[in-house]
């Protein structure tokens, strides 16, 4: 059994760590609230863009944009959004597991895979995982903007335009609620036709001045909006996961302190009992 002094030292060390995890929990809660506000403010735009694109994909167009056309799949690309920092439970691990399972299915069909990473954890993971990393961006911070994702998006669009990749997916952690964050894979290109009844009726659009020019700008803006919304959803998920992880760490530290305090009390009691026994034995010898 460790000495009372050693146990006291461990208790003190754990208490210091507990203060840190408690502070990190409060910081994460504050950041999560702000991230939720950004996420909520961006959702209407992203959803309306999705709605417009859904109608266009099912519409009778005088000009069919290449992003609307299916083609033989020889190579696919994933834009994977992760965190820059750790201490957020299994958030990144679960996401990477989902991606690797999906990649395995494509490779079994003889399809090659490329990646683009947003977040340092994704950058480091896919550098080790194998496959071609076409673009990488990290250090998005707590207040990401659309300009932060434009570079990665343009690289993937260029690869798609040139026929280097035939399908593009977006991977991120969808914020369901504080306790639940779900990794998802959404197809970006070609634009999937929605099965929603709202999009089933055909819409005829009149484009002014030029349908090609308008659709070119609209498609790029749509992709950028979806990737940006994935970034803010992932940011909210990160802070929620970190808050939960730090609360669990704080609670575990409290339980460990209680257990060590009990061990310390037993050790102290054993030491006192030993001293009394020695005194009694000495007195009896006299």
Swiss-Prot record:
Domain of life: Bacteria
Record key words, sorted: ATP synthesis, Cell inner membrane, Cell membrane, CF(1), Hydrogen ion transport, Ion transport, Membrane, Transport
PROSITE patterns: ATPASE_GAMMA
InterPro entries per UniProt: ATP_synth_F1_ATPase_gsu, ATP_synth_F1_gsu, ATP_synth_F1_gsu_CS
Keyword tRNA-binding carried by entry: no
Membrane topology: Peripheral membrane protein
Gene Ontology terms describing biological process: proton motive force-driven plasma membrane ATP synthesis
A Gene Ontology cellular-component term: plasma membrane
SUPFAM superfamilies: ATP synthase (F1-ATPase), gamma subunit (SSF52943)
Keyword S-adenosyl-L-methionine in annotation: no
An MF annotation (GO) of this entry: ATP binding
Subcellular location: Cell inner membrane
Chief localization: membrane
Function description: Produces ATP from ADP in the presence of a proton gradient across the membrane. The gamma chain is believed to be important in regulating ATPase activity and the flow of protons through the CF(0) complex.
PANTHER family referenced in this protein's UniProt entry, alphabetically: ATP SYNTHASE GAMMA CHAIN (PTHR11693), ATP SYNTHASE SUBUNIT GAMMA, MITOCHONDRIAL (PTHR11693:SF22)
Assembly: F-type ATPases have 2 components, CF(1) - the catalytic core - and CF(0) - the membrane proton channel. CF(1) has five subunits: alpha(3), beta(3), gamma(1), delta(1), epsilon(1). CF(0) has three main subunits: a, b and c.
NCBIfam families, per the entry: ATPsyn_F1gamma, PRK05621.1-1
Family per record: Belongs to the ATPase gamma chain family.
Protein name per its UniProtKB record: ATP synthase gamma chain
Encoding gene per record: atpG
């Amino acid at each position: 059994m460790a000495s009372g002094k050693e146990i006291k030292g461990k208790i003190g060390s754990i208490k210091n760590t507990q203060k840190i995890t408690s502070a990190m929990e409060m910081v994460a809660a504050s950041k999560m609230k702000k991230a939720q506000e950004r996420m909520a403010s961006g959702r209407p735009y992203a959803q309306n863009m999705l709605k417009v694109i859904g109608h266009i994909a099912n519409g009778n167009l005088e000009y069919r944009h290449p992003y609307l056309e299916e083609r033989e799949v020889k190579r696919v690309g994933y834009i994977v959004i992760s965190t820059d920092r750790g201490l957020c439970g299994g958030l990144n691990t679960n996401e990477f597991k989902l991606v690797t399972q999906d990649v395995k299915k494509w490779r079994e069909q003889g399809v090659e895979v490329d990646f683009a990473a947003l977040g340092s954890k994704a950058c480091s993971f896919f550098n080790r995982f194998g496959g071609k990393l076409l673009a990488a961006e990290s250090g998005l911070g707590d207040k990401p903007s659309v300009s932060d994702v434009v570079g990665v998006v343009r690289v993937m669009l260029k690869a798609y335009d040139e026929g280097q990749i035939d399908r593009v997916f977006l991977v991120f952690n969808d914020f369901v609620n504080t306790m639940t964050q779900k990794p998802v894979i959404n197809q970006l290109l070609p634009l999937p036709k929605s099965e929603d009844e709202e999009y089933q009726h055909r819409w005829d659009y009149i484009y002014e001045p030029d349908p090609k020019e308008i659709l070119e700008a609209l498609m790029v803006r749509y992709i950028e909006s979806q990737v940006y919304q994935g970034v803010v959803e992932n940011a909210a998920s990160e802070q929620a996961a970190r808050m939960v992880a730090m609360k669990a760490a704080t609670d575990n530290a409290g339980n460990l302190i209680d257990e060590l305090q009990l061990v310390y009390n037993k050790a102290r009691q054993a030491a006192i009992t030993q001293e009394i026994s020695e005194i009694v034995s000495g007195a009896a010898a006299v």
